[in-house]
Amino acid sequence: MRRRVLLILATMGLEVLLLGGVALADTIDGTSGPDDLVGTDQEDVIHASGGADYVSGLAGPDVLYAGAGNDTVVGREGNDSIYGNTGSDTLFGNESNDTINSAGDGVKDVVKCGIGKNDTAYVDKIDWVKENCENVFLLVRSGGA
């Protein structure tokens, strides 16, 4: 009975928070499976983990990290920083001036900066970069001994 009451009170508190229209900045961590991770209208930090994840920052200058799976990461509004990871990721900057880094994993990623006027992408030679990225830097690895 006590557990049920606590659950009801927690649900009521969440409803009050949502009805108040308050969106607080957040740090969100994914699980080892596939996740849909969506931020707030404030500045968020979102870390995907394992699985094929979907990450969206919404408004605000967000920092978004793809995880180990084949992830889709969407910046939305705000000057976002987006980082790919192992796996074949699809990274979208969307609105504002974004920085996207898919370099260093050696796996083909798709990078689309968006409608900002000063987007920057750091990529590998194998990555597919859409034409809307204004500043593109190619990671070149030197040969080892």
Task: Spell out what each predicted region is.
Residues M1-L9:
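Bacterial N-terminal signal peptides that target proteins for export
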Residues L6, G20-G21:
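Alpha-helical hydrophobic membrane-insertion segments
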Residues A25, E43, A52, C133-E134:
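Short, well-ordered alpha-helix to beta-strand connector turns
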Residues G30-G33, G39, A48-G50, G57, ...:
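Glycine-centered beta-turn/loop sites at beta-strand termini
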